[in-house]
Amino acid sequence: MITIALPKGALLEDSISIFKKAGLNFSDALLENSRSLTVESKCKRAKALLVRNGDVPVYVSYGQADLGIVGYDVLQESELKVAKLLDLEFGGCHMSLAVKNNSNYLKPTDLPANCKVASKFTKTARAYFDDLNIPVEIVHLTGSVELGPITGMAEAIVDLVATGKTLKENGLSKIDDLFYSTARLIANPLSLRLDSNPLRDVILSIESSKDILNI
């Protein structure tokens, strides 16, 4: 039986649509009152693990799941070994650098040397500023990073931005985009090497159907 790690939250519904097109129906995961963390497909050929987006690469890397769907932003932060197979082209949002509206910072190089930048994505933020040769202190936050500039703790933030509504409501604006993040299909490398046709059939079905998905 194929095991698939699906991300709970914003990516779940489209992830289920992707696998349904490939013949694996995990729609029971969308039942309003369900608290189950595992769901078997209707055809009984696969099961899904419902995990946090950030945990998908962990389950896939350690072999508890053969396949997974995860945001590109998570992959950029992770150092775990997974096979990166497909850009599924949904769940799109920008990883962005933002500052307070009333600041004088119009571009990254306007930020003062050694200023503080708040982010959940510390590896991504560090690599970005290193590439620009801008010395900054990255402050790791796990919650609402917008509070960094609001409270004066940080001059800027690096965070995911979808509609920009949260930034606007908190008096912040983007001054740069680091990259565009979408959902990605990943696999356990050993599963790819050892598995026979069933796993590869699922991957090929997803690859052939993703361009015609109306999601």
Swiss-Prot record:
Compartments in which it is found: Cytoplasm
Enzyme Commission code(s) on record: 2.4.2.17
GO cellular component: cytoplasm
Biological processes annotated in GO: L-histidine biosynthetic process
Keyword Cytoplasm in record: yes
Keywords carried by this UniProt record: Amino-acid biosynthesis, ATP-binding, Cytoplasm, Glycosyltransferase, Histidine biosynthesis, Nucleotide-binding, Transferase
InterPro entries tied to this protein: ATP_PRibTrfase_cat (IPR013820), ATP_PRibTrfase_CS (IPR018198), ATP_PRibTrfase_HisG (IPR001348), ATP_PRibTrfase_HisG_short (IPR024893)
UniProt subunit comment: Heteromultimer composed of HisG and HisZ subunits.
Domain text: Lacks the C-terminal regulatory region which is replaced by HisZ.
Name of the protein in its database record: ATP phosphoribosyltransferase
Gene name in the database record: hisG
